[in-house]
C-alpha cells in the first residue's frame, strides 16, 4: 500500500523489501493522468524510486498515456484495461516477474452490478514460483450498513463481490499462491454484521489481510490519510 502523500517525502530515502522477497503494492493513482505530463513524470519517478516487483493500479483514465509512460520506465512493463469507467492494470519489474497470462474475469452482464470494473488476473512466476494476483476496484460509497438483498445498496454489492471472488479463488486456485488486492472501498475493521469482508475474515486458515496492522493503527499510516480512510487492501 502507498500513502497518497508519499511524493511529499524525499524519494531517495524510500526503502521497501529486499532482493529476495516478492514486493508488491496497490495504488489508486486517481484519474491518471489527472494533471497531464506532470502526473506522468511524478508517477514515473515514484515507480523507479520504490523498485517494487509488482504494482496493482486503479483509476487509469487514459490507457494510451499509461502505455506511453511505461515505455519510458527502464526495467518495467505494464498492462492496463479500460472498462466503461476507469481502468485498472499492473506494473511489473521485467527482471523478476515472468508473465504466464493476463486476463479479465466476471465480464458477463450478470456480474456488472457487483463488479463495475472487471477484475484483472495476472498469472505470473517469481523465482520459479507461480503466483496469481487479482486486482480490483470495487463499488464506492454507502452508509456503512449492509442491506441484504438490496442490489442497489453499495455495501451489499461489495459484500457480494468479495464472496464471488473468494468462491472463484477457492475453486480455480485452491493450492496456488493467490493474492487479491486493490481499492476495495471498505473498511476491514467494521463490526461483523456490517463488514463486507466477513466471508474472508471467517476463513483465517486460508486468508489474511497483509495490511491488517495498518488498518487498526493510526490514521497517518492509512492509504488515504488526509480523508482519513483505509480502503485499499492486500489479501493473501
What are these regions (language model features)?
Residues 4-236:
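Divalent cation-coordinating acidic motifs and surrounding scaffolds
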Amino acid at each position: 500500500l502507498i500513502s497518497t502523500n508519499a511524493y511529499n517525502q524525499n524519494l531517495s530515502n524510500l526503502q521497501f523489501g529486499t532482493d529476495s522477497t516478492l514486493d508488491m503494492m496497490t495504488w489508486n493513482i486517481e484519474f491518471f493522468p489527472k494533471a497531464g505530463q506532470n502526473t506522468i513524470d511524478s508517477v514515473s519517478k515514484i515507480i523507479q524510486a520504490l523498485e517494487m516487483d509488482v504494482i496493482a493500479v486503479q483509476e487509469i483514465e487514459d490507457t494510451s498515456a499509461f502505455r506511453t509512460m511505461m515505455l519510458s520506465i527502464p526495467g518495467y512493463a505494464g498492462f492496463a484495461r479500460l472498462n466503461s469507467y476507469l481502468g485498472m492494470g499492473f506494473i511489473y519489474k521485467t527482471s523478476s516477474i515472468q508473465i504466464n497470462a493476463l486476463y479479465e474475469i466476471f465480464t458477463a452482464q450478470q456480474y456488472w452490478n457487483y463488479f463495475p470494473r472487471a477484475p484483472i488476473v495476472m498469472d505470473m512466476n517469481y523465482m520459479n514460483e507461480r503466483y496469481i494476483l487479482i486486482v480490483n476496484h470495487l463499488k464506492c460509497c454507502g452508509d456503512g450498513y449492509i442491506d441484504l438483498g438490496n442490489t442497489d445498496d453499495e455495501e451489499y454489492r461489495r459484500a457480494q463481490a468479495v464472496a464471488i471472488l473468494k468462491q472463484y479463488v477457492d475453486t480455480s486456485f485452491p493450492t496456488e499462491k493467490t493474492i487479491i488486492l486493490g481499492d476495495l472501498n471498505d473498511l476491514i475493521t467494521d463490526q461483523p454484521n456490517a463488514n463486507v469482508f466477513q466471508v474472508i475474515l471467517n476463513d483465517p486458515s486460508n486468508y489474511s489481510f497483509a495490511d491488517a496492522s495498518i488498518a487498526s493503527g493510526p490514521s497517518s499510516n492509512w492509504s488515504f490519510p488526509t480523508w482519513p480512510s483505509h480502503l485499499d487492501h492486500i489479501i493473501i
